[in-house]
Amino acid sequence: MKVGVLTGGGDCPGLNAVIRAVVRKGVQEYGYDFTGFRDGWRGPLEGDTVPLDIPAVRGILPRGGTVLGSSRTNPLKQRDGIRRIKDNLAALGVEALITIGGEDTLGVATRLADEYGVPCVGVPKTIDNDLSATDYTFGFDTAVGIATEAIDRLHTTAESHMRVLVVEVMGRHAGWIALHSGLAGGANVILIPEQRFDVEQVCSWVTSRFRASYAPIVVVAEGAMPRDGDMVLKDESLDSYGHVRLSGVGEWLAKQIEKRTGNEARTTVLGHVQRGGTPSAFDRWLATRFGLHAVDCVHDGDFGKMVALRGTDIVRVPIAEATARLKTVDPALYEEVGVFFG
C-alpha cells in the first residue's frame, strides 16, 4: 500500500517527529510505501513529491520545522482543486493520505473525503492549542516554553529601567499561550481574545505595580481586543484561507499605557520565534504517538478520523467534528488567575 503524507499551514515544532513515527511504523510493521508531498496542499495539487523511507527520516526527531515543507495553499480556491488532488493521488498510486495540520488543512481533508471518497487520516497541529477534539496539540508546549523564557528575561530589563514591557504572543482566537506563559512567567497582566479588555483597568494594574516599586509585565495575545474598539491590525492583508495576518495590539497597547499613565512602555513581539527551533520533550512524545496511531488508522481502514489526546490515551474522532469548533479559554479559568493581576 502506498500512503501519502503532507504538512500544511504554519510550521511548528514536532512535525518531523510525526513524519518519522508514521514512516518507521508504516514500513517496519505494515510494509507500506510512503510518498511525501511538498509544501502542504500545493504538493498534491501539482504532483510535487519526495520519497519517504526510513533513511529519509533518520535524525529528524529533534529538528524543528518540517522536512516536507509547508504552505497555506488552499485547494478550495483553485479551479477544480479538489478534483485535481484526487486525480494526482490516483496517478501516483497513493491509496491513503495522512494530513498533518490545523483547522484549515484538516477542513480540506474533510472535503476531499466527503466529496471524492479519498481515504484521509488527520493529525492535529497548531501551537495555539485551539482544536476542541484534543486535550493538547504538539507545538504548544514548545511555544509556551519559549514565551515563558522570554518573559523571564524581560523581567530583568524592565526592572533595570523601571518601564512597562508589553509582550505580544501568538493566539488568534484562543489565549492558551498567553495564559500559560503569562502565569508561568509571573506576568502582572494577561490579555486574551476570549475576554475583551478595559484599557483603563490595564493602566490601573500597571500603576499599582509601580506604586510597589515593581516594573510590570503585560502579556497580550495577538487576537486580544479592547472593550471599546476593534481588533488592532498592522496589516489588513489576508492569507489564502481568508485570515487576517495579526500583529499590532502589543504596540498599540504600549502607547496607550504610556499616554495614560506617564510611564515608559516598550513592546516585544515574539512572533515566529514561538514556532521555530527544537521541539520540547513533551511535543516530541505527543507528536510521535500521534504518528504511530495515524498509521494504525490507515491499517484499520478507519478513514475520515483524526487522532487526538484524551487524558493519556490517543483516541480517534471524526475530522469534521474536530474542526467544527474551537477550544477557547473558559472564563472561569481566566478569572482563577486574575488574583495575580496588578
UniProtKB/Swiss-Prot annotation:
Please give the name of this protein.
Answer: Pyrophosphate--fructose 6-phosphate 1-phosphotransferase
Where mainly located? cytoplasm
Enumerate the residues binding Mg(2+).
103
Q: List UniProt keywords, sorted A-Z.
A: Cytoplasm, Glycolysis, Kinase, Magnesium, Metal-binding, Transferase
Q: In its keyword annotation, does this UniProt entry include Mitochondrion?
A: no
What are the site positions for Important for catalytic activity? 125
Q: Where does it reside?
A: Cytoplasm
Q: What does this protein do?
A: Catalyzes the phosphorylation of D-fructose 6-phosphate, the first committing step of glycolysis. Uses inorganic phosphate (PPi) as phosphoryl donor instead of ATP like common ATP-dependent phosphofructokinases (ATP-PFKs), which renders the reaction reversible, and can thus function both in glycolysis and gluconeogenesis. Consistently, PPi-PFK can replace the enzymes of both the forward (ATP-PFK) and reverse (fructose-bisphosphatase (FBPase)) reactions.
Positions of substrate binding:
126-128, 163, 170-172, 222, 266, 272-275
Active site, renumbered: 128 (proton acceptor)
- GO cellular component entries: 6-phosphofructokinase complex
- At what residues does the UniProt record annotate the site feature described as Important for catalytic activity and substrate specificity? 104
Cofactor(s) this protein cannot do without: Mg(2+)
Report whether Metal-binding shows up as a keyword of the record.
yes
